[in-house]
Amino acid sequence: MSQTENAVTSSSGAKRAYRKGNPLSDAEKQRLSVARKRASFKEVKVFLEPKYKAMLMQMCHEDGLTQAEVLTALIKSEAQKRCM
């Protein structure tokens, strides 16, 4: 069998069906992501003065960390100072 015949016969078959079921919508993906986070972490909502929020964002940018990671490090540091 020549290569051209192989190419025609191999690509002429039906495509495989999507095996994982229907893809999730963006809203469903977000909901599942939040549910996973809630299972492992606690949510903290705070209101900061704009200058402190800017400081936090600057720390995040300089260190390449998320706000959660920077706040966790700050809390750990303060807890060590207080011998907790």
Swiss-Prot record:
Ranges of biased composition (kind: Polar residues): 1-13
Keyword DNA-binding: yes
Region feature Disordered, mapped onto this chain: 1-31
UniProtKB keywords: DNA-binding, Plasmid, Plasmid copy control, Repressor, Transcription, Transcription regulation
GO biological process, one term: plasmid maintenance
Listed GO MF terms: DNA binding
One Pfam family matching this protein: RepB-RCR_reg
Alphabetical list of InterPro entries matching this protein: RepA2 (IPR019661)
Function: This protein is involved in the determination of copy number in gene replication. It binds to the repA promoter thus inhibiting the synthesis of the mRNA for the initiator protein RepA.
Protein name, entry field: Replication regulatory protein repA2
Gene that encodes the chain: repA2
